[in-house]
Amino acid sequence: LAASASAQDKPVPYWASIASGEAMMRTGPAKTYPGVWLYKRRDLPVRVLKRHESWRLIEDPDGARGWMLVALLSERRTAMIKPGDARSIHASPDEGSRVVYRAEPGVVGRIDDCSGSWCHIQIGKREGHVRMADIWGVDDGEVID
């Protein structure tokens, strides 16, 4: 689903994700500006840094910044496993809980129910809890219902 009018009015910065299977990042806030990156990864988390009419200045997980039409963005919260080693996905939001699987760096999942230092994450058909420190796409200590 594309971002709703309420999402367009959110104070910046805020988190979003790529809604479309193909989304062009541009050097400026208009289709006349050159495209710098064509994203082909639905649900990729992005940080919205600035608004200009129907365009948003975004930052991707690699730190690339550019402009994207708001219609190509979604309010759906997603996160990417940070670089480094595979991260443990736990049965419950507790370091001592059973590890249900391990997620490789760069894997993207949908997040919800974040509080304290943990988020519930769904990667494909698998789900569990991941430490916020292990993902990109959520602010430290952020609460997501």
Enumerate the predicted regions with their spans:
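N-terminal signal peptide c-region/cleavage motif recognized by signal peptidases
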Residues: 2-4
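SH3-family beta-barrel domains
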Residues: 7-27, 38-42, 49-93, 98-126, ...
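Second-shell loop/turn segments in exported
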Residues: 30-33
